[in-house]
Structures are given as C-alpha cells and as structure tokens.
C-alpha cells in the first residue's frame, strides 16, 4: 500500500473519529461528513487513475454531486434549527417533527 493511500485512509479515519467525538453540534458533524466525502473522492480518483479504469471515470464526479446535495440539505437544516432554537445542537432535531 502506497503512502498516498495511507494518508487518504488516515484523513478518512480522522474525519470518522471527529464525527463520533463531536456529534453534539450539527455544524461539526457536517464538517466531518464533508471531510469523509472528500477523502473518498480522492481515494476513488487515485484508484481509477492508477488502475487505468476509464469506464468508471465518472464515479468520483457523481460522488461529488451527492456530497454537494448532502451539504446543501445539511446547511438548510442547520439554518432552520438555528433560527428556530438559537443553537445548533443535534438534540433539537427531535423537536422539528410535525
């Protein structure tokens, strides 16, 4: 395993650990999710380039599209929670039920 893969895997692991440790605030959870998605994107792009697998060259771009949609939904939820309750705690998400 090359150093590039080890560094990318370490970035993914650190983002996952951050998500598990700082899960009380919605903003920190969203940032950790974005770090995980970006490390997955880089890992997929490097793997496709190293293996010369040109048929799957659109897969990292599709992953980025889903990551952008996830970020937009997460930020809109963050704005709604912070405008309603004044904080960005994840516990407030249970109070948003109709």
UniProtKB/Swiss-Prot annotation:
<keyword id="KW-0812">Transmembrane</keyword>
<keyword id="KW-0472">Membrane</keyword>
<feature type="transmembrane region" description="Helical">
    <location>
        <begin position="29"/>
        <end position="49"/>
    </location>
</feature>
<keyword id="KW-0496">Mitochondrion</keyword>
<feature type="transmembrane region" description="Helical">
    <location>
        <begin position="1"/>
        <end position="21"/>
    </location>
</feature>
<dbReference type="GO" id="GO:0042773">
    <property type="term" value="P:ATP synthesis coupled electron transport"/>
</dbReference>
<comment type="function">
    <text>Core subunit of the mitochondrial membrane respiratory chain NADH dehydrogenase (Complex I) which catalyzes electron transfer from NADH through the respiratory chain, using ubiquinone as an electron acceptor. Part of the enzyme membrane arm which is embedded in the lipid bilayer and involved in proton translocation.</text>
</comment>
<keyword id="KW-0830">Ubiquinone</keyword>
<feature type="transmembrane region" description="Helical">
    <location>
        <begin position="61"/>
        <end position="81"/>
    </location>
</feature>
<dbReference type="InterPro" id="IPR039428">
    <property type="entry name" value="NUOK/Mnh_C1-like"/>
</dbReference>
<keyword id="KW-0520">NAD</keyword>
<dbReference type="GO" id="GO:0005743">
    <property type="term" value="C:mitochondrial inner membrane"/>
</dbReference>
<dbReference type="Pfam" id="PF00420">
    <property type="entry name" value="Oxidored_q2"/>
</dbReference>
<dbReference type="GO" id="GO:0008137">
    <property type="term" value="F:NADH dehydrogenase (ubiquinone) activity"/>
</dbReference>
<comment type="subunit">
    <text>Core subunit of respiratory chain NADH dehydrogenase (Complex I) which is composed of 45 different subunits.</text>
</comment>
<dbReference type="GO" id="GO:0045271">
    <property type="term" value="C:respiratory chain complex I"/>
</dbReference>
<comment type="similarity">
    <text>Belongs to the complex I subunit 4L family.</text>
</comment>
<keyword id="KW-1278">Translocase</keyword>
<keyword id="KW-0999">Mitochondrion inner membrane</keyword>
<dbReference type="InterPro" id="IPR001133">
    <property type="entry name" value="NADH_UbQ_OxRdtase_chain4L/K"/>
</dbReference>
<keyword id="KW-1133">Transmembrane helix</keyword>
<keyword id="KW-0813">Transport</keyword>
<keyword id="KW-0679">Respiratory chain</keyword>
<protein>
    <recommendedName>
        <fullName>NADH-ubiquinone oxidoreductase chain 4L</fullName>
        <ecNumber>7.1.1.2</ecNumber>
    </recommendedName>
</protein>
<keyword id="KW-0249">Electron transport</keyword>
């Amino acid at each position: 395993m090359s150093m590039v893969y080890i560094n990318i895997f370490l970035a993914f692991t650190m983002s996952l650990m951050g998500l598990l440790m700082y899960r009380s605030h919605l903003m920190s959870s969203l940032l950790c999710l974005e770090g995980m998605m970006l490390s997955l994107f880089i890992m997929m792009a490097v793997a496709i380039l190293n293996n010369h697998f040109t048929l799957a060259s659109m897969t990292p771009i599709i992953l980025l599209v889903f990551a952008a949609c996830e970020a937009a939904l997460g930020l809109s939820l963050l704005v709604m929670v912070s405008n309603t309750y004044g904080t960005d705690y994840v516990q407030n998400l249970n109070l948003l039920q109709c």
